[in-house]
Design a protein with these regions (language model features):
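Conserved N-terminal segment of class I S-adenosyl-L-methionine
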Residues: 1-120, 130-133, 198-199, 211, ...
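A structural micro-motif
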Residues: 77, 97, 144-145, 191-192
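Acidic/polar helix N-cap motif
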Residues: 111, 125-128, 178
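Short catalytic micro-motifs in class I SAM-dependent methyltransferases
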Residues: 120-127, 149, 172
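A short glycine-rich, Lys/Arg-flanked "PGG" loop and its adjoining helix->strand segment in the class I
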Residues: 130-145
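Short, glycine-/aromatic-enriched active-site segment of Class I SAM-dependent methyltransferases
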Residues: 147-175, 180-185, 209-213
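Feature marks short, surface-exposed loop/turn motifs that line or immediately flank catalytic pockets
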Residues: 154-156, 200-203
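Conserved S-adenosyl-L-methionine
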Residues: 191-202
């Protein structure tokens, strides 16, 4: 049930470890490697779509680093962090962010108000993806947008590693949709002008590292092994995956009517 999911992400040992030990140790590295590039990428997307973001809600805001980096670029923007974890919500408040310490399903008084709702690496965790997206849509003003990043089962590393992938890790990661599945899901949630991209950059490295840990992982796959061993070929392969929407890291954006 949703109640059990809420309890798990608030109180489970693994969730507490992530919030209190794991993430603090890598927060600043992720700021440089992930969150700043994410903000730059989103700014470019907003410019392409002429989205004027005066009010932005981030669902599953975590440490608040994304919103903090966004504020550096747009200091006048109204920002809201929606985060159910008490330690992570505290961290967001320490960054002077407005915080709602709830799962998004329990947020009240915020309907039809955001120009953009972002939700990074959360959809793969949720109990009911359709109901979850419908809640995100509810928060957006008419004409506003919902942007989700999540895992895509069409992605190279998931397809190659499959059950040996570290990304397939219930009860944490339980939802894996293909590109076409994301389109249909967003449309069923009442969103229009849905676009899916896979801008991931780690698929090839993930498979290469997995092969280093288990040299027999791609036994008999001579062509693929040769491709992965050559740096220039590996780089070209990753670029191809992005262009063809075959990376496991997906961005999905849709607009509210």
């Amino acid at each position: 049930t949703i109640a059990n999911f809420e309890l798990f992400y608030r109180q489970s040992k693994s969730s507490c470890y992530y919030a209190e030990v794991f993430f603090p140790a890598i927060a600043e590295t992720r700021r440089e490697k992930i969150f700043r590039p994410r903000v730059e990428q989103l700014i470019k997307l907003c410019e392409e779509k002429a989205i004027n973001v005066k009010r932005l809600f981030d669902v599953g805001a975590g440490f608040g680093i994304f919103l903090e980096e966004w504020r550096k670029c747009f200091p006048q923007a109204q920002l809201l962090a929606i985060e159910p974890s008490a330690p992570l919500a505290r961290e967001c408040r320490s960054k002077s962010l407005e915080v709602v310490e709830e799962t998004v399903e329990n947020v009240v008084g915020r309907d039809n108000s955001a120009d953009l709702v972002t939700c990074f690496e959360v959809l793969e965790h949720v109990y009911d993806p359709l109901a979850f997206l419908q809640v995100l849509r509810r928060l957006v003003r008419p004409g506003g947008y919902v942007l989700v990043s999540t895992l895509c089962i069409d992605g190279f590393d998931l397809q190659v590693l499959w059950d040996k992938s570290n990304q397939i890790s219930p009860p944490h990661h339980i939802n894996f949709l293909p590109v076409e599945g994301f389109k249909k899901l967003f449309q069923r949630a009442g969103l229009i002008n849905v676009e899916v991209t896979t801008p991931g950059r780690l698929d090839v490295d993930i498979v290469r590292n997995a092969c280093k840990s288990d040299p027999e992982l791609l036994q008999g796959q001579r062509f693929l092994n040769n491709l992965l061993e050559d740096d220039s070929s590996a780089t070209a392969l990753q670029n191809f995956l992005v262009e063809q929407r075959k990376s496991s890291h997906a961005w999905v954006i849709g607009q509210k009517k």
